[in-house]
Regions:
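C-terminal substrate-recognition "lid" of short-chain dehydrogenase/reductases
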Residues: 3, 124, 214-243, 247-248
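The beta1-alpha1 cofactor-binding region of Rossmann-like NAD(H)/NADP(H)-dependent oxidoreductases
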Residues: 40, 61-73, 106, 219-220
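Catalytic Tyr-X3-Lys loop
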Residues: 102-121, 140, 164, 212
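Active-site helix of classical SDR
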Residues: 124, 160, 168
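Alpha-helical segment proximal to the catalytic Tyr-Lys
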Residues: 129, 173-177, 234
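Residue(s) in the substrate-gating loop at a strand-loop-helix junction
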Residues: 144
Length: 250
């Protein structure tokens, strides 16, 4: 029997992209998966696509920049299932590209920080008590290759993803003795439906930045998340796992 049979996991920002791929992977492994996003109709559509029965993939509306909504989301999950065993803090935005720090709009900066690091903080703040109530569990925070290297022109995203790694390590140390593991993953460019809409020359450039000369698939990222959520990684916490085709090894 799969580790995920009888387990409940929340994936934030799962209406599309990597989050959707993670939710599908966990559902296929036997988990009950709650998926959240800002636009409920899109989240419901994704949930139905993954699980037409509506029994094991449940859509929730939550803006991760709102602590009240995040808290309510966890309360809803516990009210419906009585337990939460895994959390994937995936929700995030990139913000402006090719923009110097001196030209970066302050509101844009705040928006990236509010989603990409405050949202992770809220997820941990209200998610960890839910995991403790369930006897412990595993958390995977989505950082990025930008979480351990600097890239010019995308300073807010880079700063936020570095911060995700920092809070991951702090949370891992705080709760290691209580049966909660916290890790971060750092994908490179992932071949999501949104990426597939980009001009071919842009896609080729993205692929070329990885030594393996291609982009990651959503399944490859989801497989790493599933590994870190499962007991297969039971002695791993506070770590960063690259899924980047060798990018950060350069």
């Amino acid at each position: 029997m799969s580790y995920f049979e009888g387990k409940t996991v929340l994936v934030t920002g799962a209406a599309t992209g990597v989050g959707e791929g993670v939710a599908q992977r966990l559902y296929q492994a036997g988990a009950t998966v709650f998926i959240s996003g800002r636009q409920l109709e899109q989240v419901k559509k994704t949930a139905y696509t993954i699980d037409p029965t509506g029994e094991k993939v449940i859509a929730l509306q939550a803006d991760m920049t709102s602590p009240e909504q995040v808290k309510s989301m966890f309360e809803t999950i516990l009210a419906q299932t009585g337990a939460l065993h895994g959390l994937v803090n995936n929700a995030g935005i990139t913000g402006p590209h090719n923009t110097s720090i001196v030209d970066y709009n302050i509101d844009d900066w705040k928006a990236v920080m509010d989603t990409d690091i405050n949202g992770v903080f809220y997820g941990l703040k209200y998610g960890i008590p839910a995991l403790l109530r369930s006897g412990g569990g595993s958390i995977v925070n989505l950082s990025s290759t930008n979480g351990i290297v600097g890239i010019a022109g995308i300073s807010a995203y880079t700063a936020a993803k570095h911060a995700v790694l920092g809070i991951t390590r702090s949370a891992a140390l705080e709760f290691a003795h209580q049966g909660i593991r916290v890790n971060a993953i750092g994908p490179g460019y992932v071949d999501t439906p949104r990426m597939q809409q980009l001009p071919n020359e842009v896609r080729q450039w993205m692929a070329s930045t990885h030594p393996m000369k291609r982009m990651a698939t959503r399944k490859e990222v989801a497989n790493m998340v599933a590994f870190l959520l499962s007991d297969e990684s039971s002695f791993s916490t506070g770590a960063f796992y690259a899924v980047d085709g060798g990018y950060t090894a350069q």
